[in-house]
Amino acid sequence: MANPYFQFKKFTVWHDKCAMKVGTDGVLLGAWASTERCQRILDVGTGTGLIALMLAQRSTAILDAIDIDSDACLQAQENIAKSPFANRIQVYQTSLSEYMPDENIKYDLIVSNPPYFIDSLKCPDTKRNLARHTDTLSLPDLLRDSRKLLAPEGNIALVLPFEQRESLIDIAREESLSPSREAHVSPIPDAPPKRLLIELSATPVAKPKSSHLTLEIERHRYSEEFTAIAKDFYLKM
């Protein structure tokens, strides 16, 4: 039986009630997204609350976390309540399109590990389908609705399959967003990138920063660059 929780250095993430479990994608985004000068952060599709918790650990920002699924929201609330960051994170059950923050709040950073199974066959688990498939949150909808909530100097940070890079940039351009920073993530040395970490900005950047990130140099041996961003979270680093 899979472990119902994942223990990090400063908090524990239970995922027994949530369709999508703790995984490398969420850890990557939570460790990589820039929190510099961030006062307000929005986590879209929070699931267990993992990314919100990681960003709270890395910043002094106030965070709002939203999810359309009631069980995910309950799980996130429980995980956050038991963490040292409970006073800075609020969870709301809502879709992004219907989310209306108080007092016309604008966010310095909006993060999402969005659904990305576009054409694949669906599994019998309805809640897992909701979390994995783009029926409920397409990239055009995600960027359009996030853009409305973004501060003028803010960023949108995402983790996606690498093959979606070109289509994402095209969609972003339609919303007057452009890449400011990205990392191409490979599982092992010399393997093609499997994941894309990308920050989109409403302010054009003359020379976007691009890097390559390898997760493991061999089985169960993390690379130096992944260790550098994840060591404050993983117990065995």
Swiss-Prot record:
Keywords: Cytoplasm, Methyltransferase, S-adenosyl-L-methionine, Transferase, tRNA processing. The keyword Chaperone does not apply. One of its GO terms (molecular function) is nucleic acid binding. It catalyses: adenosine(37) in tRNA1(Val) + S-adenosyl-L-methionine = N(6)-methyladenosine(37) in tRNA1(Val) + S-adenosyl-L-homocysteine + H(+). One of its GO terms (biological process) is tRNA processing. It is found in: Cytoplasm. It comes from the Bacteria. Its EC number is 2.1.1.223. Its main location: cytoplasm. InterPro entries: DNA_methylase_N6_adenine_CS (IPR002052), SAM-dependent_MTases_sf (IPR029063), Small_mtfrase_dom (IPR007848), tRNA_Adenine-N(6)_MTase (IPR050210), tRNA_adenine-N6_MeTrfase (IPR022882). The keyword Cytoplasm applies. GO terms for cellular component: cytoplasm. It is an enzyme of class 2 (transferase). Belongs to the methyltransferase superfamily. tRNA (adenine-N(6)-)-methyltransferase family. Specifically methylates the adenine in position 37 of tRNA(1)(Val) (anticodon cmo5UAC). PANTHER family: TRNA1(VAL) (ADENINE(37)-N6)-METHYLTRANSFERASE. This is tRNA1(Val) (adenine(37)-N6)-methyltransferase. It comes from Parabacteroides distasonis (strain ATCC 8503 / DSM 20701 / CIP 104284 / JCM 5825 / NCTC 11152). The lineage of its organism: Bacteria, Pseudomonadati, Bacteroidota, Bacteroidia, Bacteroidales.
